[in-house]
Amino acid sequence: MAISIKTPEDIEKMRVAGRLAAEVLEMIEPYVKPGVSTGELDRICNDYIVNEQHAVSACLGYHGYPKSVCISINEVVCHGIPDDAKLLKDGDIVNIDVTVIKDGFHGDTSKMFIVGKPTIMGERLCRITQESLYLALRMVKPGINLREIGAAIQKFVEAEGFSVVREYCGHGIGRGFHEEPQVLHYDSRETNVVLKPGMTFTIEPMVNAGKKEIRTMKDGWTVKTKDRSLSAQYEHTIVVTDNGCEILTLRKDDTIPAIISHDE
């Protein structure tokens, strides 16, 4: 399937969907504290998406996924299923991954929350993971190959003593939740996509404190690090512009501009 180039009208709708997804993460922040269940956080997010934003969660029912957001704690790499029995505790690192649909278009984003008092490793892993995403975002412009971006993420992460998960990647996005291209966060000879203005996709590195290997739990969704080391992830949805990119899911706590341009 070809990579779709979005029209200005499409991009405007994606700005709206992206802003809504970012707002869910901004809204949930004060609720992420020791003693709260991931099931409760999911309900708060779902109520906000449905009743305040008048939007739809793309995750709910996607391939049978039972909840509205993914909440992944500590050694859980991704796709953690919210559960009333799963309570957050001091020092946990928690990824909340939100995808909303508004007016037919998707906005997909995730960030790490540190519960209560951070551990040194947890804080460092989260910081390096976010820095790897920012490094990638600053590289995006027409004419660059996605392979260069994946290689740069891998080099940066491994220089810090961490590893990049291979099995999951960023993806094209728009009317579809997962479109072409695949956006790998490591160097691969199979990647050969030259960026053009109007392409929309996510960059979402998953970084493990230990080794890169993962395993999927019996529920068929929850993915953990094989060595039980901590794992972190940050994700933004972006559009390639004529001279860089625009981040469609920027939050108030982000420390990178929404529009990155490479004009001389």
UniProtKB/Swiss-Prot annotation:
Changing H79A: Reduces activity 100000-fold for the Co(2+)-complexed enzyme, but only 2.6-fold for the Mn(2+)-complexed enzyme. The keyword Lyase does not apply. One of its GO terms (cellular component) is cytosol. Substrate binds at H79, T99, H178. One of its GO terms (molecular function) is metalloaminopeptidase activity. A divalent metal cation 1 binds at D97, D108, E235. SUPFAM superfamilies: Creatinase/aminopeptidase. HAMAP family: MetAP_1 (MF_01974). This is Methionine aminopeptidase. It comes from Escherichia coli (strain K12).
